């Protein structure tokens, strides 16, 4: 998306910051970001992003626009020697976990599942072992640094010696302050997201469901 923005709007320089969904929304609130991407799962409602946007950008009208859906699941070692099959395996004391950093969508998903299953984080071997990307988690599992970790399906196809256990389809959205949508620059960004060229490029990457790409999911 960033590359397409710069190609379509040569006078605009797009800066990307990989800081996690939670921090991205906070920076949007703090006027340090123009657009935030988010995949934050609310364990109480099983909904993505909407409640977090309301809480982290209080009183600020925002528009939530879908970018894609993707599958989250467990990375496990090739052949799944520990027979890991689902969320209930988080209760097992014979497994070691590779976690993600605080503030990212994967960490919020894990912590929500622990609440849902009434599991204390202290019961998770490796809860404090953090990596900072899907790729790093998958690589750690492949190297035997842990038995499993959460990440997206697409990355599992890039790393040897791991298998992928699909668990949950997540909605990955863009969050824009509603008042900004009157700006021609933001209108052009929405045109890019809705264009066949952008969708074809995203589909070509594999692992993404584009059924709602460009659709307004909610207005807060």
Task: Give the location of each predicted region.
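Short loop->beta-strand "edge-of-pocket" segments that line small-molecule binding or catalytic clefts
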Residues: 88-108
């Amino acid at each position: 998306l960033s590359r397409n923005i710069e190609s379509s709007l040569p006078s605009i320089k797009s800066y990307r910051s990989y800081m996690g969904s939670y921090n991205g929304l906070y920076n949007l609130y703090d006027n340090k970001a123009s657009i935030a991407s988010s995949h934050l799962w609310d364990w109480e409602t099983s909904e993505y992003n909407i409640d977090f946007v309301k809480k982290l950008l209080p009183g600020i009208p925002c528009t939530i626009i879908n970018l894609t859906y993707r599958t989250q699941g467990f990375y496990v070692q090739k052949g799944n020697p520990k027979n890991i099959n689902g969320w209930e395996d988080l209760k097992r004391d014979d497994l070691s976990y590779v976690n993600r950093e605080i503030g990212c969508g994967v960490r919020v998903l894990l912590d929500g599942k622990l609440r849902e299953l009434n599991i204390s984080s202290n019961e998770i071997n490796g809860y404090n072992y953090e990596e900072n990307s899907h790729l790093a988690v998958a690589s750690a599992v492949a190297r035997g640094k842990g038995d499993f970790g959460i990440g997206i399906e697409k990355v599992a196809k890039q790393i040897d010696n791991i298998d992928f256990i699909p668990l949950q389809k997540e909605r990955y959205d863009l969050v824009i302050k509603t008042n900004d949508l009157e700006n021609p620059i933001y209108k052009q960004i929405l045109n890019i997201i809705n264009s066949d060229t952008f969708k074809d490029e995203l589909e070509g990457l594999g692992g993404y469901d584009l059924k709602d790409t460009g659709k307004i999911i909610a207005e807060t």
